[in-house]
Amino acid sequence: MEAMLVDCVNNSLRHFVYKNAIFMCERLCAEFPSEVNLQLLATSYLQNNQAYSAYHLLKGTQMAQSRYLFALSCFQMDLLNEAESALCPVNEPGAEIPNGAAGHYLLGLIYKYTDRRKNAAQQFKQSLTIDPLLWAAYEELCILGAAEEATAVFGETAALSIQKQYMQQLSTSLGLNTYNEERNSTSTKNTSSEDYSPRQSKHTQSHGLKDISGNFHSHGVNGGVSNMSFYNTPSPVAAQLSGIAPPPLFRNFQPAVANPNSLITDSSPKSTVNSTLQAPRRKFVDEGKLRKISGRLFSDSGPRRSSRLSADSGANINSSVATVSGNVNNASKYLGGSKLSSLALRSVTLRKGHSWANENMDEGVRGEPFDDSRPNTASTTGSMASNDQEDETMSIGGIAMSSQTITIGVSEILNLLRTLGEGCRLSYMYRCQEALDTYMKLPHKHYNTGWVLSQVGKAYFELIDYLEAEKAFRLARLASPYCLEGMDIYSTVLYHLKEDMKLSYLAQELISTDRLAPQSWCAMGNCYSLQKDHETALKNFLRAVQLNPRFAYAHTLCGHEYTTLEDFENGMKSYQNALRVDTRHYNAWYGLGMIYLRQEKLEFSEHHFRMAFLINPSSSVIMSYLGTSLHALKRSEEALEIMEQAIVADRKNPLPMYQKANILVCLERLDEALEVLEELKEYAPSESSVYALMGRIYKRRNMHDKAMLHFGLALDMKPPATDVAAIKAAMEKLHVPDEIDESP
C-alpha cells in the first residue's frame, strides 16, 4: 500500500496535479508516519506554492533532505536567518550542506540577501565545483561581479568532473546488471519472494546515487519481510528507469525527493516478476512525451525567483543531452551581423513555431535508439558484459548513450556554456560591446532565443543605443512571447524613445500574460511616467516592489518617480532599498548622487557618482555628472579629465561636451569652449542650451551682435520655461558687463 501511495503522489507531481498529490500524501503520512513521507508531503506543498505549510510541517526535523526543504520554505517566506540555521546547524559546525550543489546555491542566495557578498560568492563557486552545469550559480557570480572567466569555469576540469559522475553511474549500472545476471543463473526456484535483502538493497543504492539522507522511502512497515522486499529492492527494470539515472546534479535547483522515490515506484509489485524471466522494460511515459516534457522544462528561460527555487521536483525527468552545432562563419545566420537587420524578423518568425522537442530529436545527441522492444534484461546485461567499454551504454533522459557519446555531449554542452557564460560575465561588467561580440559567436539557433536576444537588448541599452536595443527586445518578444526576462528594460527603452503607443501596448500585453510579475508593473509604470502622470506611475512601481521585494530595478524606478515629484526623502529610501538587494545596481548609486547634487551636498554627490562609476566605468552619463560634481567642488582639472573620458566613451552623447564647454568658460578658456560648442552643434543641432551658452561667451567677448543672434536662435528652439526666462534676462542685460550683472 505504501509504495502504491508513493507512486500515486509522484505521478500527480509529474503531471502537476498538486491538489491530488497533497491529498494522497496526507493519506500516506497518516497510514505510514515517517519523516521521509513528510518530505514528500512538504515537496507537494512547495510545488503548490504553500511554503508556509511546508514550514510548519518540517519545523524541528533533522534529516538532511528535511533541512533542505525547510530552508527552502523559509527562503520563500523571507525567513533568511531560519533558512541559514537549517542549512548550517549551530550545534553541528562541521555538518555537510544538504543536497550538494543545490544546497550551496540556496545558502549563497541567503548570504547574498543578508549582505555577505564574499560568503555568497564562495557558496556559488562551491556549487559550481560540485555541479559545473548549475548555470544559475554562475549567473549569480556574474551579478556579484565575482565570476571567473567562463573558459576557466566550464573548462577541462568541469568536463572531467561531469564525465566522472556519468562514468560512475555507467559502472554502477553494469555492476548491478552483472549481479542480477549471476543471481538469475544460479536460481533454480521461483525467486519472486526471495529478493535480496534490504541491507543489500541499501548497499546497491549507495553506489547508484549520492548519499542524500531522506531521499529514499526504505523505512520499515509492519507488513511482513517478504512484502517489503518488493518495495525496497530495485529490480533490473527499475534500475534501468531510475537507478542508473545521472547523479542528482540539481541543475534546475529542485528538491531531490521525487526522483529518488521512483526507486520505490519502479520496483513496486507491478514490475516485480520472476527473476529468472524479466519482462520487457516498461515506461511511465513514452519516449516522445519524455522528450517534450524535458525540452519544455529546460527551455523555460524566465521563471520568477519563487518558482525557480521551488521548481517541480515531481517532474524531475532528466533532459536529453543536446548537441550544439559548431559556429558557422556565415554572418547572415545572426540577426544582421553586428547590428540587428530586418532579415532577423523573418528568421525569428520562422523559428517561432519550431518545436523545441523536435529540435532536440533532430539535432540532439544521436546515441543508440531507445528501443522498447529489447530482449529481457538478463540477456541484455549478458550482451553488455561481452562488449568493449566503448559499447557500454546507460540511459540518460530515456536515450541509451555510450561512454564515447557522453564525452562528446559533455564537451559540446560546455562549449556552449563557455560562450554564454563569457557573454553574461562581460555584460555584468558593463563591457557591453565585448559582450555583443561574444554573443555573435553563438550558433544561430541559440542566438535567436529569447534569453540571448534580451541580453543583447540590455547591452545596447547600456550603450545608449536605444534603437538597436528596441530591435533586439522586439525580436526577443517574437522568439519568446511568454518570457518576461528583460521586459522591464524594454519598457525603459521605449520610454526613452518616447514610443507612447508601443509602450502602452507592451504594458497591456505583459499584464495579460502575468499580472503577478514585477516586470509587467514596471512597464505599466513607465507608460504612465511617459504621460507625465507620475503619481499613478509610482503606484505601479510600488506594486512591482510588493510582488517581488528583491527586484532592485523596481525600487530604483520608485526612486526616480519620487525624485521627479521632489520627494527626496522617499526617493533616497527607494534607492537605498535597491542597493540592499544589489549593491552593484549602479542606477541606484546614480540616483542618490542626483538627489545630493540637487540638494547641493556636493561631497555626498561626488561619492555616490564615483561608486556608480566604479561599477560601470563605461557610462558617459555617470562620468558627466561625476565631472559636474567635481567642478562644483572647485576641482575643475579633474572634472575636465573625466569629461574627456566621457566624450571618448560616447561621441553621440552631447552632455559631456556641453559640460566640458561650461567648465572651460568658468576657467576663462573661451576660445576652447567655442570650439567644443561648434563641434557639439553637429551632434545636437536643435539643443537650445548650446546656443544660449554660445551667446554668453560672445557677450563676454563683447561681440554683442553674435550674442544676440545666438540668444534668438536658442529662443526659436522652444526651450523650457525656466530657460526662456534666463535667456530673455541675458538679452535685456546684453550691454551690461558680467561683473556688474553678477554682483548682488
UniProtKB/Swiss-Prot annotation:
Domain of life: Eukaryota
Pathway(s) this gene product operates in, as recorded in its UniProt entry: Protein modification; protein ubiquitination
Segments annotated as TPR repeats: 101-134, 450-483, 518-551, 553-585, 587-619, 621-653, 655-687, 688-721
Tissue expression from the record: Specifically expressed in dividing and elongating cells.
Main location: nucleus
Keywords: Cell cycle, Cell division, Mitosis, Nucleus, Repeat, TPR repeat, Ubl conjugation pathway
Effect of loss of the gene: Dwarf plant with small leaves and stunted growth. Defect in cell division and expansion. Defective endoreduplication. Cdc27a and cdc27b double mutant is gametophytic lethal.
InterPro entries: TPR-like_helical_dom_sf, TPR_rpt
Disordered: annotated segments: 180-218, 359-390
Pfam family, one: TPR_16
Signal peptide (residue range): none
GO cellular component terms listed in the entry, alphabetical order: anaphase-promoting complex; cell plate; nucleus; spindle
Compositional bias ranges of the Polar residues kind: 180-199, 375-387
Subcellular localization(s) per the UniProt record: Nucleus
Residue stretches of biased makeup (Basic and acidic residues): 363-374
A biological-process GO annotation: cell division
Oligomeric form and interacting partners: The APC/C is composed of at least 10 subunits. Can homodimerize. Interacts with APC2, APC10, FZR2 and FZR3. Interacts with PANS1. Interacts with SAMBA.
Family from the record: Belongs to the APC3/CDC27 family.
Chain's role: Component of the anaphase promoting complex/cyclosome (APC/C), a cell cycle-regulated E3 ubiquitin-protein ligase complex that controls progression through mitosis and the G1 phase of the cell cycle. The APC/C complex controls several key steps in the cell cycle by mediating ubiquitination and subsequent degradation of target proteins such as cyclins. The APC/C complex is required for the female gametophyte development and is involved in several aspect of development by controlling cell division and cell elongation. Involved in the control of endoreduplication.
Name under which the protein is recorded: Cell division cycle protein 27 homolog B
Source organism of this protein record: Arabidopsis thaliana (Mouse-ear cress)
